[in-house]
Amino acid sequence: MDYRACTSALRMPVLLLLLCTFSCNLAEQEVENLSGLSSNPDKNIFAIRENGTTCLMAEFSARILVPYEVPSSNEVDWDLEEASIQLPRDTEIRGKCWNNESELHLSWLDKAYTLKLFFSKEGQDASKSRSWKMSKIQFLYDPSEHTIFKSGARPGRHTANSHHLSLMVTPAGMSYECEATQRISLTSTDHQKIVVLYLSEVHLQPFDIKSDFVYSEEYKCPTDQRKQLEETLPLILGLTLGVAILIIVAVYHIHHKMTANQVQIPRDRSLYKHMG
């Protein structure tokens, strides 16, 4: 066999693999920062579209508390401080959408800060119990950025990670909604300090979006469900009590009317002599 022919035959699978990879990377992705539509200045709205179809939607308010150290007044020790970082509206968005995994990356201040949210699906495709969840959170930061951190803070880029996360578990095909504030602890590479992420006014759907920019049916978090029950329970009890009172009044009225129409029989036997 000709050497050139053999070489060409061997190259074909490699070329096909490269073409496949290249075509996948060419998948057209659009990111939308729609935070300006929210009346709440602290709330952010994001959407990711691939090939003209919305594949991830997210709305939430995020605040991050980061402990860090600055030199003490004696210039020997270190004092512990805490930075409060609000997710701003002018955020750079990136993301990825796959069948069973999705990611949302949010960066700001020239990527001095980056918040990454990871989502995954669970269960078999044919199973009715199939669901999705937030499976991982990463926050990247550098205390030497002086817009938020005090000067003199220990420099160095750090990453705060979640461990064994299973948040916002939602039935497949539904969106997740939670007005209540959720507190999530992350462990930092900065001497294992605990970074705290607060999420509120959350509405998320990282999979199975049927219409562009339209959430599927909402699955409310347990806290919101309890709050809704607490708000509606007094109304239900009031209506039940009102109906019970109406029934009692109606029964009394009917009973009174029936007894009024009956012939009154004298109880004193001496009165019987006047009868007949």
Swiss-Prot record:
Q: Where are the transmembrane segments?
A: 232-252
UniProt-listed InterPro entries: Lamp2-like_luminal, Lysosome-assoc_membr_glycop
Q: Which GO terms describe its cellular component?
A: cytoplasmic vesicle membrane; dendrite membrane; early endosome membrane; endoplasmic reticulum-Golgi intermediate compartment membrane; endosome membrane; growth cone membrane; plasma membrane; recycling endosome membrane
> From which residue to which does the signal peptide run?
1-27
Q: Which residues lie on this side of the membrane: Extracellular?
A: 28-231
- What is a single Pfam family found in this protein's UniProt entry? Lamp2-like_luminal
Alphabetical UniProt keywords: Cell membrane, Cell projection, Cytoplasmic vesicle, Endosome, Glycoprotein, Membrane, Signal, Synapse, Transmembrane, Transmembrane helix
**Which residues are glycosylated according to the annotation?**
33, 51, 100
As for membrane topology, the entry says: Single-pass type I membrane protein
On the tree of life, the source organism's domain of life is: Eukaryota
Where is this chain primarily localised?
A: membrane
Explain the purpose of this protein: Plays a role in short-term synaptic plasticity in a subset of GABAergic neurons in the brain.
What protein am I looking at? Lysosome-associated membrane glycoprotein 5
